[in-house]
């Protein structure tokens, strides 16, 4: 059995070789000659999986090591009897930590306490729900907007988008990309929403580029709209708008979910799904795959405050490390993908064990996702 895996999926070759012959290939584009005789295809979000790619091939299973699936025509796969699995939630923690890093950077730059802000979370799925829990643990007021969940009668208080826009200091988007239907999210942040957004707000998009109308956003900023903007995703990719990049506060090359843990979860989830599909179910212990981080232990003396928390978070990951490289090379063809392909190893907060002599601080750090040890 021939299994194609994206060359940037960590641990894929080692895992999938237990099930067949593995060939690592670039994801954008998939070499058509590699598809000849292949039985399974494991991709990331850079690969468009549809009839144009797979018609006439022998592929019988597709796995995507990503939470989002808008790059996959799963309806066509189903019609063809091709098995399919994604990796929901695999990078949710990574995206949450990206958002925190960006907010902490802005808090330091602009002289505010995150606890004093109201954060509007648009899309309360795997990412949004985790972000909500961690913000609430820190004492931050959150407002939630999720029309599908609201219509199902889920046990949360959900806000209409138009009201949330007026109330929240921060808008952070965590929705799938739905191009039509009752829950369309394509260009959710359009001219109308941006006009309604009061000056001085923070707008973050770390889900799908087209959820925010990039042309409308650039137009608003050029006309003097006073917003702090964080964009990890762009419309389109990889040919992002250079004028927009020049005006945002933080711009990164679609790497919010790119922790080593998040990537490894994506690989292991599709590996387990494919092994189940073959009738050879296997499970993988994530910790057995991961190397020791550069910083694995640190002692915190006294009570945790927001300044100390920012330093802890930025010790593990500071979003500014990904902003500067993109600005240096964004005007060069192929560099957006190169930054993603050769992304510097990044770990999650859980990789750092913080030794605490204060029980309340240890409890809070645990709720935020750090490993802790009470002295």
From Swiss-Prot:
Binding site for NAD(+): 146, 175, 232, 257
Tree of life domain: Bacteria
E.C. designation(s): 1.1.1.290
Catalyzed reactions: 4-phospho-D-erythronate + NAD(+) = (R)-3-hydroxy-2-oxo-4-phosphooxybutanoate + NADH + H(+)
GO biological process annotation, one example: 'de novo' pyridoxal 5'-phosphate biosynthetic process
Single annotated GO MF: NAD binding
UniProt entry tagged with the keyword NAD: yes
PROSITE patterns linked to this entry: D_2_HYDROXYACID_DH_1, D_2_HYDROXYACID_DH_3
Pathway(s) served: Cofactor biosynthesis; pyridoxine 5'-phosphate biosynthesis; pyridoxine 5'-phosphate from D-erythrose 4-phosphate: step 2/5
Record InterPro entries: D-isomer_2_OHA_DH_cat_dom, D-isomer_DH_CS, D-isomer_DH_CS1, D-isomer_DH_NAD-bd, Erythronate-4-P_DHase, Erythronate-4-P_DHase_dimer, NAD(P)-bd_dom_sf, PdxB_dimer_sf
Subunit structure: Homodimer.
Protein name: Erythronate-4-phosphate dehydrogenase
Organism listed in the record: Yersinia enterocolitica serotype O:8 / biotype 1B (strain NCTC 13174 / 8081)
Name of encoding gene: pdxB
């Amino acid at each position: 059995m021939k299994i194609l895996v994206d060359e940037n999926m960590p641990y894929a070759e080692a895992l999938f070789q237990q099930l067949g012959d593995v060939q690592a290939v670039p994801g954008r584009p998939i070499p058509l000659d590699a598809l000849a005789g292949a039985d399974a295809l494991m991709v990331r979000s850079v690969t468009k999986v549809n009839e144009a790619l797979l018609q006439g091939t022998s592929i019988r299973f597709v796995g995507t090591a990503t939470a989002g699936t808008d790059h996959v025509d799963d309806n066509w796969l189903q019609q063809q009897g091709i098995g399919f699995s994604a990796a929901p939630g695999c990078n949710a923690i990574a995206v949450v930590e990206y958002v925190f890093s960006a907010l902490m950077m802005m808090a330091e730059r602009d002289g505010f306490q995150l606890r004093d802000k109201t954060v509007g979370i648009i899309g309360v799925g795997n990412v949004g729900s985790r972000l909500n829990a961690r913000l609430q643990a820190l004492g931050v007021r959150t407002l939630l907007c999720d029309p599908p969940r609201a219509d199902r009668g889920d046990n949360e208080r959900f806000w209409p988008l138009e009201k949330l826009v007026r109330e929240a200091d921060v808008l952070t988007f965590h929705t799938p990309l739905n191009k039509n239907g009752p829950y369309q999210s394509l260009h959710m942040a359009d001219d109308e929403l941006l006009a309604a957004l009061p000056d001085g707000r923070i707008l973050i998009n770390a889900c799908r580029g087209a959820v925010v109308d990039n042309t409308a956003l650039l137009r608003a900023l050029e006309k003097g709209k006073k917003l702090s903007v964080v964009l990890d995703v762009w419309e389109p990719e990889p040919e992002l708008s250079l004028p927009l990049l020049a005006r945002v506060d933080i711009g990164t090359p679609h790497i919010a979910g790119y922790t080593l843990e998040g990537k490894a979860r994506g690989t292991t989830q599709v590996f387990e799904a494919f092994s189940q599909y073959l009738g050879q179910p296997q499970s993988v212990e994530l910790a057995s795959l991961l190397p020791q981080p550069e910083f694995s232990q640190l002692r915190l003396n006294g009570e945790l405050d927001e300044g100390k928390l920012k330093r802890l978070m930025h010790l593990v990951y500071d979003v500014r490390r990904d902003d500067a490289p993109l600005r240096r090379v964004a005007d060069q063809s192929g560099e957006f993908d190169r930054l993603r392909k050769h992304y510097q190893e990044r770990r999650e907060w859980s990789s750092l064990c913080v030794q605490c002599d204060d029980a309340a601080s240890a409890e809070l750090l645990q709720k935020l996702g750090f490993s802790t040890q009470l002295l």
